[in-house]
């Protein structure tokens, strides 16, 4: 169903959000790359504080590992995205389905590319409570969660979801992103700046993708249809 174009203001907000997140991401990236002393000190302080607690709380560690390895795992998020893409394609929204899939893929490429480029080491412990491989910055778990939740929130808004549904989804999205960010630092496999970078980069990818889509398609803010 075609409706009047999306007003310029929402498109402008998306673009501004994307540019702000991109700029902050770039600043953080540079600070991490040059190992800016105040940031490194903050990362170390937070990591050591949480690790001291983690080694004395095996039950809480187990809960966090279940959450990070199953509930908020990147592959769980990718499966959720794939289900949404298939549903959109099945409903005939093939451009939108492709756009969501491409955005998710782009986020993964950006994430892996930056990990390789920065090559930041993860925290190392004599008594680790969990382990992870490859470079630390940005956090893949967090960036994938932000992109997945962000895309779902965008789709709900795009299809005119009821306010109660949209706000409920927003609460779940915030809990998911904050939750996975906490688990990664608490389990000692990421620095605080890694998860902040994941949030900023994920937000930048989603906002800029949505802004470009809105500009190219002139899609309405709400069509009265469900995204699923």
Mark where each language-model region is.
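N-terminal transmembrane-helix/juxtamembrane module of multi-pass inner/ER membrane proteins
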Residues: 1-76, 117-129
